[in-house]
């Protein structure tokens, strides 16, 4: 659980960002042409709602309602004095989807160091036996197949560096090819150097397109890839691809990005963003030690 001092620090970051976001929104948003609709501002600010979502995914609670009523309203009331009812909080979650996304993209993501890892993980929304009666994500989620078999839901595409910091993420339906997000400029805008992936990212056209943008896509070689060579350092770093698998594991088992209790698509997105934000604020992340040790004891002269 995050300490109270850390909660205050994160809240100040989120509050400053929300104030800047509201100022820019008011400056560039078009005025309504029709009759002005009455809109009552909430007693709980956007930064407080964002902070509650981040705290939930780092608290160990499995039920958001129980966490809010028992933890926030009782034990953290001195940090959140303007608490609202649970039903009202669920309504306010939808309003922070865009600010929370930009807060993650502009503030919480790490920086590229020249060594990056890419992978995708599945997000099931129901069991396979319930696909034909599932209604919450009907028309949005799709059937897909991965190394774990068939599933119904979405894919979360991630890029991280050797420090375990997320560099970017993208959410797609389950039937989207893993290589498809790498074709979008916004997904690889701040990526440079070597990008390591599994065999699912092998593609001649994709390699050439990324190489033009200054990205070298490194994957394991297939038996029919004659004439392809790989340096020793690339082979060693390919063995360390488990770092992004560990990131996926922490997102699922600690931050709870995957469960089947969602009741609408809006809250699914906000909970997913809250989990990603919570992971970005973890004090300890999986990392790789890339320090080189020069030892000449075995050198032959």
Label each region the model flagged.
Residues 1-301:
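Short alpha-helical elements
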């Amino acid at each position: 659980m995050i300490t109270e001092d850390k909660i205050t620090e994160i809240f100040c970051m989120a509050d400053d960002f929300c104030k800047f976001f509201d100022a820019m929104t008011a400056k560039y948003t078009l005025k309504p042409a029709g009759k002005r609709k009455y809109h009552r501002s909430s007693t709980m600010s956007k930064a407080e709602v964002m902070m509650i979502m981040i705290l939930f995914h780092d608290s160990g609670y499995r039920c958001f309602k129980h966490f809010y009523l028992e933890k926030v309203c009782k034990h953290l009331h001195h940090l959140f004095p303007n608490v609202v009812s649970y039903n009202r909080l669920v309504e306010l979650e939808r309003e922070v989807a865009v600010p929370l996304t930009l807060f993650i993209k502009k503030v919480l993501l790490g920086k590229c160091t020249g060594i990056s890892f890419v992978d995708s993980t599945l997000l099931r929304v129901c069991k396979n036996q319930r696909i034909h009666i599932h209604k919450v994500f009907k028309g949005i989620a799709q059937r897909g197949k991965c190394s774990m078999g068939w599933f119904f839901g979405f894919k979360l595409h991630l890029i991280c560096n050797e420090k375990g910091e997320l560099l970017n993420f993208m959410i797609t339906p389950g039937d989207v090819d893993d290589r498809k997000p790498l074709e979008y400029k916004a997904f690889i805008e701040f990526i440079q150097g070597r990008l390591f992936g599994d065999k699912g990212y092998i593609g001649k056209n994709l390699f050439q397109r990324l190489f033009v943008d200054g990205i070298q896509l490194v994957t394991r070689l297939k038996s029919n890839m004659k004439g392809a060579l790989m340096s020793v350092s690339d082979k060693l770093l390919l063995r360390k691809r488990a770092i992004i698998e560990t990131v996926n594991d922490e997102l699922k088992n600690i931050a709870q990005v995957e469960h089947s209790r969602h009741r609408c698509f809006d809250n699914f997105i906000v909970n997913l963003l809250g989990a990603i934000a919570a992971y970005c604020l973890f004090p300890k992340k999986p990392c790789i030690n890339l320090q080189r040790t020069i030892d000449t004891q075995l050198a032959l002269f």
